Amino acid sequence: MMGLATGADDMIVREMTAQENTALVSAGRLARLACASEGQPYMVPIHYAFADNYLYSFSMLGQKIDWMRSNPKVCAQIDDLTSARNWKSVVVYGVFEELADRIGTKVERDRAWSLLEKHANWWEPGSLKPVLPPVASASNHVFYRIYIESMTGRQAVEA
């Protein structure tokens, strides 16, 4: 266990276990997704659903999608903040996979749709709620998933 003393109001920061990391990611709905292009980082909030070692999400076309298409290595940060001295944070490292509307990805695309639609307002960061699962040729909507390669987590509690 790693500790950090901060004066009269001590706080302990410790590494979370793999099981604790997975529990936080599973319970979460909002992440901060980071990608990079030509050495320039870019971070945005996303709504997501977690299943089978993937984060599933949805977006409109734009900088985030363009950058992930050119460099699929990404990370996402998910947290549970109770207070400045009581929080959990997990960083997920993974690989972007676009779920285009074509033969070979329909099952994964439909799975993303079904997982995301279980959560209220999942479409808000994507700007527009589709009525039916969107068709790539008729829409600028992009379903994607992040394959999780590894996770690290920290937890802070008041001592």
Q: Where are each of the predicted segments found?
A:
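Extreme N-terminal tail/first-helix region
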Residues: M1-A27
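Charged, gly/pro-rich active-site loop segments
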Residues: M2-A5, D10, R85-A159
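Short beta-strand segments
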Residues: G28-M60, A76-Q77
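Short, solvent-exposed loop/turn elements at beta->coil junctions and helix N-caps
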Residues: A36, D79-L81, P130-P134
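Helix-adjacent hinge/juxtasegments
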Residues: L61-V90, E97
